[in-house]
Amino acid sequence: MSIHHLARANVLALEPYLSARRLGGQGNIWLNANEYPLPPGYGLRGGNLNRYPACQPAGVINGYAAYAGVQPEQVVVCRGADEGIELLIRAFCEPGADAILFCPPTYGMYSVSAETFGIARRTVEARQDWQLDLQAIRARLDGVKLVYICSPNNPTGNLIDLETLRAMLEMTHGRALLVVDEAYIDFCPQASVVNWLAEYPHLVILRTLSKAFALAGLRCGFVLANVEVIQLLLKVIAPYPLALPVADIAEQALSDEGLRQMRTRVAEINTNRETLAHGLADCPCICAVYPSVSNYLLVRCDPAYRVFKTLWDQGTILRDQSKQPGLADCLRITIGTLAECQSVIAVLRALKPSSSKESL
């Protein structure tokens, strides 16, 4: 006997977010999830696993507040920035009444999280330069409680212009929260809007330890906001969101030595990104390599499925973005080690475009 008649209708209709791990693959070079390619060297410092953890462990909160340049009371730590996306929806959106707004092509969890909670989704596609269409957004703001903007944007890799973000804050004042997803900001920290929190009470920032901190497996993220927002989020967060081992390693990552290691990784990845970008520009099967300030590159291929399968068959796994608006024949390539980048370049230099007579 099926139990589907007991399930919520919107969950039955839900198309789940397909993470890199759910999509799977058999490879030895994983360039599909924007992870750091090598594990960091943190170890557990042990103890007291018989006790429940603190809801908001002081060492983690204080460490991240100091790193981000905010007060501890402006920080919530959660199970990845994905949980931050959900906490905001749970705290601010009424199912069946309110909506969120986002601007594809962008990160898929804004849509999935809203649909899971029965919140309407409004989209305003980005312009051809992947900047925001302010006029179109203004026309769709009625009933919107949360606007999610990813900067640097995943998967395109570009920053949203600061003047555009400021215009969005003025536009949403008194109407909605503007949530700036800065999951990749550690690769370009000068572009953060964290210093604007004092000026805009409706600004919210999402952060993570998954990217530059090389801790994707830890599932540790942060919401930065003004105290009034933080207090509401603490009403709906789980009582023990961070396991003791997670808090232990996160605190180590936010130490002076942990921050030094993170900045070394950022410099390495930024250098490897330029190496990969220059190498791909010379590959006949690559039509465009788009500028990026993050730990991945978006490339347009001739055609994407052939480039994807060629690398897949050789054990290198990328992320196909072709179904996103405006990204036909586009693949996203995570920046790996120098050797991994050179391997991708070597394979693709030998691959002719489908339009080439030599490839027939």
Curated annotation (Swiss-Prot):
The modification N6-(pyridoxal phosphate)lysine is found at K211. InterPro entries: Aminotrans_II_pyridoxalP_BS (IPR001917), Aminotransferase_I/II_large (IPR004839), HisP_aminotrans (IPR005861), PyrdxlP-dep_Trfase (IPR015424), PyrdxlP-dep_Trfase_major (IPR015421), PyrdxlP-dep_Trfase_small (IPR015422). It comes from the Bacteria. Keywords: Amino-acid biosynthesis, Aminotransferase, Histidine biosynthesis, Pyridoxal phosphate, Transferase. Pfam families: Aminotran_1_2. GO terms for biological process: L-histidine biosynthetic process. This is Histidinol-phosphate aminotransferase. The gene is hisC.
